């Protein structure tokens, strides 16, 4: 049952207090990708710091869960760019 509460908490905004830990995890993983791929992706997460600061004052469950989703999508896209699966103009040929 604890797992269900964790999942529901994401959509209720209960896990939003851990967004800083989530951001640090994404930065660390991005740094590791940059280390092994030669792509310095760690600096691109600086824009999320201000976004997170603004988002922390808003208590809307849809906004809180969307923050996690957006950050995860950006991390995945940057990972694909780091490994050169996709380029800045789309899928590499």
Curated annotation (Swiss-Prot):
Bilayer topology annotation: Multi-pass membrane protein
Membrane-spanning residues: 1-21, 22-42, 60-80
Main location: host cell
Annotated keywords: Host membrane, Membrane, Transmembrane, Transmembrane helix
Compartment annotation: Host membrane
Single GO cellular component term: host cell membrane
Domain of life of the organism encoding this protein: Viruses
Official protein name in the record: Putative transmembrane protein ORF25
Origin species: His1 virus (isolate Australia/Victoria)
Organism ancestry: Viruses, Viruses incertae sedis, Halspiviridae, Salterprovirus, Salterprovirus His1
